[in-house]
Amino acid sequence: MGSTGRICLELAKMMEKKGHNCRIIYGRKKATKESGEYGMRMTSSFGVYIHGVETRILDNHAFASTFETLRLLFFLKIYKPDLIHLHNLHGYYINVAVLFRYIITNKIPVIWTLHDCWSMTGHCSHFYHIGCNKWISGCHNCQQKKEYPASLVFDKSKKNWEKKKKIFTSLDCAVIVTPSIWLSELVNKSYLNKYQIKVVPNGIDLNVFYPRDDSMFSKKFGYKKIILGVSNVWTENKGIYDFINLVDMLDASKFQIVLVGEVKKDFEIPSNIYIIDRTDSTDELAKIYSSADIYVDLSKIEVLGTTIIEAMACGCPIVTYGAGGNSESIGEYGGRIIEKQNLSSVVDAIQQMAFLDKNVIRGACVQQAKIFSKEKMLENYYLLYKKLVNYE
């Protein structure tokens, strides 16, 4: 389960504790044991595949899966939600036109948390790293047509931007939530600026993410300093190539790179990068963070680095590019921000920080992470829920 899934699960558990009913509708992969109590998958692997084909050929992302979305509407007609909290509407599983038509017809209040920029563009989920501003006045001739959600044939970015603008600005009662100030400023420049925009930083469970025993890697790697990276799936935008290049820039006798997450076969990973398959256990993840000496985030763009916050909560200092909202996560004491994507500067920061007093640096990181507690996030969302549907 990724960070967005964990947020949804925590919100569902909170609502249940307060005496309300909540269901999580999701598109892909199996639910965990914990999330299965609340979750309902709305499409099959075959449905995801067909949606993917339409995306690859027709650039029809989020306008396929009509049958699956109609099946969702059948559930909603029975469930009769007082409020719908939207998260990611991309991912090969839903038809946004069908969904929004139902929401508008039934006048259901909406909170929409944006975890990227897809809702503002005709195609891509992020544009900041390539300096594109077409999304402000109208996408066309997309430079990232072959990036997620990739289209290998047609470029419908102009038409898709127009369709999304018409659909996404048609809600009667909606609040847009962003996890970072950085993303809220982008939303203010987009067609979504007709709605109220609220910043609610992602929160983490500080009862799970806290400094643990730090000896997980000592038997395997001895006294080497552990440089850690975590991602659900490693991609170019998540910095996989920079980690590969980092191997040759660090002294192998002093440093060991450890990456957690799915690494696709397309990438030739050096044998001296240690890979841990993606884990759904937050307890295991907290132990991994606690055993690292430095957490390195080399993403080209991040809305708000939730894994950065988790690492800090476990006492691990950060080295990261100043991409998107990452600087909001780290604050003044959580680590080092590299403003330009310069690997030499990353290496310098790693070498300087790796040999600082670990106890002192841990305390500073833990204090910074407390700003992003799960409880603060949940309370902010609950206040929004009450405001939109007027319940106590």
Where would I find each of the regions flagged by the language model?
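Short alpha-helical donor nucleotide-sugar binding micro-motif in glycosyltransferases
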Residues: K287-A292, Y381
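Aromatic "clamp/platform" in nucleotide-sugar-dependent glycosyltransferases that forms part
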Residues: K300
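Short hydrophobic beta-strand element within catalytic cores of glycosyltransferases
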Residues: P317-T320
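Short acidic/histidine- and often glycine-rich active-site loop of Leloir-type glycosyltransferases
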Residues: E268, A323-I337
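Nucleotide-activated donor-binding/catalytic signature segment of Leloir-type glycosyltransferases, i.e.
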Residues: G261-A286
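Conserved acidic donor-binding segment of nucleotide-sugar-dependent glycosyltransferases
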Residues: R278, E332-L343, Q352-D357
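Conserved donor-binding/catalytic core segment of Leloir-type glycosyltransferases
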Residues: V177, K220-K238, I244-V247
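Acidic anion/phosphate-binding donor-loop and adjacent secondary structure
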Residues: E185-N188, I204-K219, F267-E268
